[in-house]
C-alpha cells in the first residue's frame, strides 16, 4: 500500500537530512521528491503561484502511489503556493498520509545551515528573506522544534 510522508519547513531546518535517512532506511520502493531538485535544478522555476514544479511534484507522487511506493515529499512548500497540490495528494493517499513540519527558530536554522556543505549556496540574509514563521498546513501529525535531533525526527517518523 502506498504511503505519503510530507516533510516541510524553512531552509536549513533539517528536511533533506531526515528524508535522506528515511530513504536509506526503507530502501527500494521509496521515492524521494525533493522540492529543490524539481523546482530549482530540473525546471529552473521561481517560487510563485502556478510554477511548473507544482504539477511535476504531483505527477511524481501519483506515480509513486500507482506503484505502491513510500513517497517522501520534502521541501519548503509554502502553503500559499503549494497547499492545494499537497491537499490533493493527501486526498489521494488518504489515511496513509503523514505530514511533518520543522518549526525551528530562525537562529537554530542558521546554526544548522552553517554545518552543511550547502552553506556557500545561500547566506543567512537569504534565509531571512525567505523565512516564513509557522507556515503550517493545519494537518501535520507532528512538529519538530529546536530541541529535536535528526535521530528524534527519524524515530518519530519511522514508528508510524
Name each model-derived stretch.
Residues 13:
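ATP-binding Walker
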Residues 19-67:
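Conserved substrate/cofactor phosphate-moiety recognition/catalytic segment
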Residues 10:
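P-loop (Walker A) phosphate-binding loop of NTP-binding proteins
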Residues 115-160:
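Small-molecule kinase domains that catalyze NTP-dependent phosphoryl transfer to phosphate-bearing small molecules
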Residues 52-94:
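Glycine-rich phosphate-binding loop used to anchor ATP phosphates in small-molecule kinases
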Residues 16:
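Walker A/P-loop
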Residues 7:
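Hydrophobic anchor at the beta1->P-loop junction of P-loop NTPases
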Residues 93-112:
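Conserved phosphate-donor/acceptor-positioning beta-strand/loop module used by diverse small-molecule
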Amino acid at each position: 500500500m502506498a504511503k505519503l510522508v510530507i516533510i516541510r519547513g524553512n531552509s536549513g531546518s533539517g528536511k533533506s537530512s531526515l528524508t535522506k535517512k528515511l530513504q536509506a532506511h526503507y530502501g527500494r520502493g521509496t521515492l524521494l521528491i525533493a522540492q529543490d531538485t524539481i523546482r530549482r535544478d530540473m525546471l529552473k522555476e521561481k517560487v510563485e503561484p502556478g510554477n511548473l514544479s507544482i504539477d511535476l511534484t504531483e505527477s511524481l507522487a501519483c506515480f509513486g502511489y500507482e506503484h505502491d511506493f513510500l513517497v517522501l515529499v520534502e521541501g519548503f512548500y509554502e502553503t500559499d503556493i503549494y497547499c492545494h497540490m499537497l491537499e490533493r495528494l493527501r486526498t489521494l493517499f488518504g489515511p496513509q498520509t503523514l505530514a511533518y513540519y520543522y518549526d525551528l527558530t530562525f537562529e537554530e536554522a542558521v546554526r544548522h545551515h552553517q554545518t552543511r556543505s550547502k552553506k556557500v549556496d545561500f547566506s543567512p540574509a537569504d534565509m531571512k528573506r525567505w523565512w516564513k514563521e509557522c507556515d503550517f498546513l493545519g494537518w501535520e501529525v507532528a512538529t519538530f522544534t529546536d530541541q529535536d535531533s535528526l535521530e528524534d525526527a527519524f524515530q518519530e517518523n519511522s514508528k508510524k
